[in-house]
């Protein structure tokens, strides 16, 4: 009976993506979450890191306009699905 709470706790934790289908779903979620944050005109390209880090999905985004190309990084919390976009990198 004492093991029952432990079992419920394990069942409540998110599953770790380990199958090819789970990783593909993770990449699609990361891409969709990051693209939803782009509020700029222009052609958008995105490169999603296949696995991210332990806690975050990561993507690089580029927005190309007539004025040039802005590059940004997007991170998505794997547990909550919340995504954030950095300010554009400066050209040096």
Model-predicted segments: where are they?
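Positively charged n-region of N-terminal signal peptides that target proteins for export
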Residues: 1-4
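N-terminal signal peptide c-region/cleavage motif recognized by signal peptidases
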Residues: 7, 12-14
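Mitochondrial intermembrane space
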Residues: 17-92
């Amino acid at each position: 009976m004492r093991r029952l709470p432990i079992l419920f706790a394990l069942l409540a934790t998110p599953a770790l993506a380990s199958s090819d289908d789970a990783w593909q779903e993770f990449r699609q979620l990361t891409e969709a979450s990051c693209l939803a944050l782009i509020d700029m005109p222009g052609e958008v390209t995105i490169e999603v890191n296949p696995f991210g880090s332990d806690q975050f999905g990561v993507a690089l985004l580029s927005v190309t306009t007539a004025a040039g190309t802005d590059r940004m990084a997007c991170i998505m919390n794997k547990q909550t699905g919340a995504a954030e976009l950095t300010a554009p990198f400066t050209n040096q």
